[in-house]
Design a protein with these regions (language model features):
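Extracellular jelly-roll beta-sandwich "head" domains, especially the C-terminal globular C1q domain
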Residues: 3-150
Length: 150
């Protein structure tokens, strides 16, 4: 067996831009085309910013992002992701029953600075985000996970 060769160059590290942002507490009657607010910030690292209680999420780093969202409404609904007030194609997700998690996911190219939001896009009516579903503690009724992948 011969000698071990030289160590090659270190590859690129994983992107260090990601965020978990969520809502706890009732949100009454999000109107058609209304924005979903987020009461809390989880871990936010890198070029993403959010002010608790607001619906807009600021992306400060250009790149390719994986975005997953969840909304739990009080009736059948359709929610979608928007980038700078434009619908992101392929992100209208729906559920056909009340109090079920409506979950969507997309990979999208974002040029910073940009604003991401979730909207009650094409539901039949206003949607309420309720609490105390299935138990005695307030649960997360809307959330978004954003991860820069390149």
């Amino acid at each position: 067996m011969g000698a071990t060769g030289a160590t090659g160059p270190t590859g690129p590290g994983a992107p260090e831009t990601f965020a978990y942002i969520y809502n706890i507490g009732t949100v009454e009657d999000i109107p058609l085309d209304g924005l979903v607010p987020f009461s809390n910030n989880g871990l936010i690292v890198g070029g993403i910013a959010h002010e608790p209680g607001t619906p807009e999420i600021l992306i400060n780093e250009t790149g390719i992002y994986e975005i997953t969202f969840m909304v739990q409404g009080d009736r059948v609904n359709q929610f979608a992701l928007f980038l700078n007030d434009d619908l992101i194609p392929g992100t209208i997700y729906s559920v056909g029953a009340a109090n079920i998690q409506n979950t969507g996911r997309v990979i999208v190219s974002i040029t910073a600075p940009a604003i991401i939001s979730i909207r009650n896009h094409t539901s039949f009516s206003p949607i309420t985000l309720e609490t105390l579903i299935g138990g005695t503690q307030d649960q997360v009724n809307a959330a978004v996970l954003i991860r820069r992948i390149s």
